[in-house]
């Protein structure tokens, strides 16, 4: 079901369970809309209309037949002081799938409509409580996988990204006004000093926007986590290294080549980041069909991974199959690992690779060096600070890139004395793209795609 394509009426009253499904001490049913109090009054034992905003009251819920359903606490939030900007009632009932569903059914029978995914946050956006970037931050807050991602989402929810976009818009609006005046009063022309100032303002703003675009690298890592793939020939110790990184026996370790036939995945936290770790089948020339399929999947996992750990056997040294693998991996995202250094290998060849680590997965020697090397590759310019504004949403990145492209066209146009009518068109387009980020100019299809990702009840 598409969200925005449903008829939307600002005063329509909606309801949904706002807490996760399953058993628990307390569950919350949220009601929001102009008729929230009227709906609650039909089913709650207390004098709903006499309650002040942001007060909680104990009472009972009854169905239309007068049968007792549950003892509850009701929380009243009136008008603009609520999350949605509309009258809101929260019913705090006993947790558990059955009782929670029964209370919701009573609420819906009293006149509320079942909420669509993200509809409460959509109401908050429509009622001016938050802009679109802040609305998206709500979802990112819920889905945050680590402390840094949580901090970035909180910052965006408080308006850090929105304020930066508004600052860009303010500067560009002033430039657009000058260009519009040039169109309206061509006989006045533009002073060369003004032309130079415009060029400088455009360049400075474009560079500031590019910094924000470049923050997407770190933002995406915080938001999505990182996928790391272990590859290598059979019996080089990939499974042992996976177990060492996970600090548990997840993969079967065997001296028999080809034990790992499929991609084995697990998750861990490394320096606060969410990591998906994949152990793959040993890559070699194989005749058996099942092993061939495992090798094909290994190569696919290698291509899709954010980071590759290419494991070599230090005891055996560099073999022909290892050399072939070294030719296939992209070194900018590959750490080459000499494993089994506990066996005192001698005369290891010097490998000219950017990232090289010596360790023993079996004895857990050198793991800290591996952690540090992973950090070095992940954070190209160092980890982000708490104060840094990051974009974590590809939609924001694309809008900024389009806005910058329009500014570049204006700069080129000024340099080549292009008619101001064409320059103003590009300025408007740049502002239009920025407006997409905070929702001042956005299509219904995009809104539908954004809010449909939310859970029901948020």
Swiss-Prot record:
Its EC number is 3.6.-.-. It comes from the Bacteria. GTP binds at residues 235-240, 254-260, 279-282. Binds 1 potassium ion per subunit. Residues 225-379 form the TrmE-type G domain. It is found in: Cytoplasm. It holds the Pfam family MMR_HSR1. Mg(2+) binds at residues 239, 260. Keywords: Cytoplasm, GTP-binding, Hydrolase, Magnesium, Metal-binding, Nucleotide-binding, Potassium, tRNA processing. GO terms for biological process: tRNA methylation; tRNA wobble uridine modification. (6S)-5-formyl-5,6,7,8-tetrahydrofolate binds at residues 30, 90, 129, 458. One of its GO terms (cellular component) is cytosol. The keyword Nucleotidyltransferase does not apply. It is an enzyme of class 3 (hydrolase). Homodimer. Heterotetramer of two MnmE and two MnmG subunits. Exhibits a very high intrinsic GTPase hydrolysis rate. Involved in the addition of a carboxymethylaminomethyl (cmnm) group at the wobble position (U34) of certain tRNAs, forming tRNA-cmnm(5)s(2)U34. Belongs to the TRAFAC class TrmE-Era-EngA-EngB-Septin-like GTPase superfamily. TrmE GTPase family. This is tRNA modification GTPase MnmE. It comes from Protochlamydia amoebophila (strain UWE25).
């Amino acid at each position: 079901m598409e969200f925005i394509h449903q008829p939307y009426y600002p005063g329509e009253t909606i309801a949904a369970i706002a807490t996760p499904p399953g058993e628990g001490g307390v569950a919350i049913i949220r009601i929001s809309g102009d008729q929230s109090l009227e709906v609650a009054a039909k089913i709650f034992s207390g004098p709903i209309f006499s309650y002040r905003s942001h007060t909680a009251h104990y009472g009972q819920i009854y169905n239309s037949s007068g049968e007792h359903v549950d003892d509850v606490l009701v929380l009243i939030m009136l008008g603009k002081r609520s999350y949605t900007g509309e009258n809101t009632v929260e019913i705090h009932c006993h947790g558990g799938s059955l009782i929670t569903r029964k209370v919701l059914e009573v609420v819906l029978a009293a006149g509320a409509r079942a909420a669509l995914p993200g509809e409460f946050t959509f109401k908050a956006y429509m009622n001016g409580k938050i802009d679109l970037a802040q609305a998206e931050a709500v979802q990112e807050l819920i889905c945050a996988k680590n402390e840094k991602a949580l901090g970035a989402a909180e910052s965006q929810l408080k308006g850090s990204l929105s304020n930066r976009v508004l600052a860009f818009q303010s500067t560009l609006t002033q430039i657009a006004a000058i260009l519009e005046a040039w169109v309206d009063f061509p006989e006045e022309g533009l002073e060369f000093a003004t032309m130079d100032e415009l060029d400088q303002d455009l360049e400075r703003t474009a560079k500031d926007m590019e910094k924000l675009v470049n923050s997407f690298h770190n933002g995406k890592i915080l938001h999505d986590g990182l996928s790391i793939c272990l590859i290598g020939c059979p019996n080089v110790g990939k499974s042992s290294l996976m177990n060492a990184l996970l600090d548990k026996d997840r993969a079967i370790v065997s001296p028999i080549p080809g034990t790992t036939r499929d991609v084995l995945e697990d998750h861990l936290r490394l320096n606060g980041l969410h990591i998906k770790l994949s152990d793959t089948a040993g890559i070699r020339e194989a005749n058996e069909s099942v092993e061939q399929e495992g090798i094909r999947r290994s190569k696919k996992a290698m291509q899709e991974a954010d980071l590759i750990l290419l494991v070599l056997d230090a005891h055996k040294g560099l073999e022909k199959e290892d050399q072939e693998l070294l030719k296939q991996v992209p070194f900018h995202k590959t750490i080459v690992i000499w494993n089994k250094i506990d066996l005192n290998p001698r005369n290891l060849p010097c490998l000219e690779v950017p990232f090289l680590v010596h360790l023993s997965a079996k004895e857990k020697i050198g793991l800290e060096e591996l952690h540090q090397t992973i950090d070095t590759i992940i954070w190209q310019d160092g980890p982000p600070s708490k104060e840094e504004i990051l974009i974590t949403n590809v939609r924001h990145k694309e809008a900024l890139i389009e806005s910058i492209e329009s500014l570049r066209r204006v700069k080129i146009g000024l340099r080549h004395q292009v008619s101001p009518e064409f320059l103003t068109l590009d300025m408007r387009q740049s502002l239009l793209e920025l407006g997409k980020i905070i929702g001042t100019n956005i299509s219904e299809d995009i809104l539908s795609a954004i809010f449909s990702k939310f859970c029901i009840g948020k």
